[in-house]
Amino acid sequence: MYRFTDFDVSNISIYLNHVLFYTTQQAGDLEHMETRNYSAMTEFFLVGLSQYPELQLFLFLLCLIMYMIILLGNSLLIIITILDSRLHTPMYFFLGNLSFLDICYTSSSIPPMLIIFMSERKSISFIGCALQMVVSLGLGSTECVLLAVMAYDHYVAICNPLRYSIIMNGVLYVQMAAWSWIIGCLTSLLQTVLTMMLPFCGNNVIDHITCEILALLKLVCSDITINVLIMTVTNIVSLVILLLLIFISYVFILSSILRINCAEGRKKAFSTCSAHSIVVILFYGSALFMYMKPKSKNTNTSDEIIGLSYGVVSPMLNPIIYSLRNKEVKEAVKKVLSRHLHLLKM
């Protein structure tokens, strides 16, 4: 049997010390490298649609024109709902909230998008990306709740007109609008904080035209189970349950409209609800395509086009739809414009 001498024990001890030192040093270097990668994330590069350089100027002009239409149309709708006393009702109060929401939503995404279209670098700061995400998620969630609230308002107005002023009193409809904003802001804040706290491991190229949460999560190199779970629950509530409530409201509304004997009353009810239903189809159609379809590793051009539609086209069309489909809004617009034109002539 071999017996260890003092010399052997000394050599083994020295060898183990070297191994321990080398392992500790390697772990420290790795930890330092990871910390450096995590802390060095100060900006992101948005490369969505950059594979079509010949379209950058066209997209810039298109989005700029749409943005001006959004600001003009939604601002006009807000102004007439304030100035015209006939529009001081819950329905137009919610419509004013929707117009203000569309202005805020597009103002958070379109100006940075315009800069990126004309920029060679196509970068956005970490803070700017987080702010864009929290605003877009918050206002998107708020719009889901607000559209459901508007559907309930239509339901009460058509199915229970005699008690409408009692049910939709001033306190209730202001609280409903306020809670729409609060719920949207809280859900977006939670999702944004949980996403921006994740390690990106130096990968800062976002394959999208905005800081969209799904595109950003593809850059994460750690477990995103909690993020996916929260996003799934939020999407089910915002996109499925609320859409189902809107659908149920319209089933009752349609059955009540068909029982109206007066042709003029039936036409007015249809015109009021048709504008809201078109807005719901546009908004939820784009949102369901973006957030509920099977996800792929790479972002498709169709995803970016739908994202552009979701963030630009719908807010642009909302005031146009409500103006064309609503007689009271058209009359209020004519009244406000004629008054200002008369003042200009004087």
UniProtKB/Swiss-Prot annotation:
This is Olfactory receptor 13D1. The chain crosses the membrane at residues 58-78, 87-107, 132-152, 172-192, 230-249, 270-290, 304-324. Keywords: Cell membrane, Disulfide bond, G-protein coupled receptor, Glycoprotein, Membrane, Olfaction, Receptor, Sensory transduction, Transducer, Transmembrane, Transmembrane helix. Residues 79-86, 153-171, 250-269, 325-346 are cytoplasmic. PANTHER family: OLFACTORY RECEPTOR (PTHR26453). The lineage of its organism: Eukaryota, Metazoa, Chordata, Craniata, Vertebrata. It is found in: Cell membrane. Glycans are attached at residues 37, 300. Belongs to the G-protein coupled receptor 1 family. It is a multi-pass membrane protein. One of its GO terms (molecular function) is olfactory receptor activity.
